[in-house]
């Protein structure tokens, strides 16, 4: 499902390619949409969508959009900081940190995002719609909203020990 390439230090993953149709008076005009994920494997990850009459053109547009749309994720080593819930449309995702050696336990589109971000140990589940675009969006929302204890402590004016109890 996910095609992987290495380019300029970034991991590029092809998550989905769909054929779409525009209906006109003379029939249907087919084009392709591509959904890609790009990451450096060290906390920076982005996703993009591209649309074109040919598959390779759609993929290159999607990769370019993904490189422009990168975010930085606060990771705790090779896992997440804390459990995260997020949703986009009818897709809901739940991700929780896992101990070393667990691996990436996640389905399809979520797996591509987490691996590109550099998360090596995580337990994740997708509920509701499994539409790849919505799952990727929900996963991004969850990763973007995740905060480290250091940032929470700084925001509250407390020490990390007081935050973690």
From Swiss-Prot:
Is Membrane tagged as a keyword?
Answer: no
Q: Kindly state which keywords UniProt assigns to this record, in alphabetical order.
A: Ribonucleoprotein, Ribosomal protein, RNA-binding, rRNA-binding
Q: Does the keyword Ribonucleoprotein apply?
A: yes
Q: Which GO terms describe its cellular component?
A: small ribosomal subunit
Indicate the segments forming the S5 DRBM domain, all copies: 10-73
One matching Pfam family is Ribosomal_S5_C
Q: What Gene Ontology terms for biological process does this UniProt record contain?
A: translation
What free text does the record give on domains? The N-terminal domain interacts with the head of the 30S subunit; the C-terminal domain interacts with the body and contacts protein S4. The interaction surface between S4 and S5 is involved in control of translational fidelity.
What is the documented function of this protein?
With S4 and S12 plays an important role in translational accuracy. Located at the back of the 30S subunit body where it stabilizes the conformation of the head with respect to the body.
State the oligomer form and interacting partners: Part of the 30S ribosomal subunit. Contacts proteins S4 and S8.
Q: Which family does it belong to?
A: Belongs to the universal ribosomal protein uS5 family.
What is the official name of this protein in its record? Small ribosomal subunit protein uS5
- Source organism per entry reads Acinetobacter baylyi (strain ATCC 33305 / BD413 / ADP1)
């Amino acid at each position: 499902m996910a095609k992987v390439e290495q380019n300029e230090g970034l991991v590029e993953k092809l998550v989905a390619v769909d054929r779409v149709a525009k209906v006109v008076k003379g029939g249907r005009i087919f084009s392709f949409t591509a959904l890609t994920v790009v990451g450096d494997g060290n906390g920076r990850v982005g996703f993009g969508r591209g649309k074109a009459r040919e598959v390779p053109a759609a993929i290159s547009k999607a990769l370019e959009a993904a490189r422009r749309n990168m975010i930085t994720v606060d990771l705790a080593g090779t896992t997440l900081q804390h459990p995260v819930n997020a949703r986009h449309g009818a897709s809901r995702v739940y991700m929780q940190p896992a101990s070393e050696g667990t691996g990436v336990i996640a389905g399809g589109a979520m797996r591509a995002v987490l691996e590109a971000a550099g998360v090596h140990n995580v337990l994740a589940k997708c509920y509701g719609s499994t539409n790849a675009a919505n799952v990727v969006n929900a996963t991004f929302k969850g990763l973007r909203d995740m905060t480290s204890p250091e940032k929470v402590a700084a925001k509250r004016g407390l020490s990390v020990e007081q935050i973690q109890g």
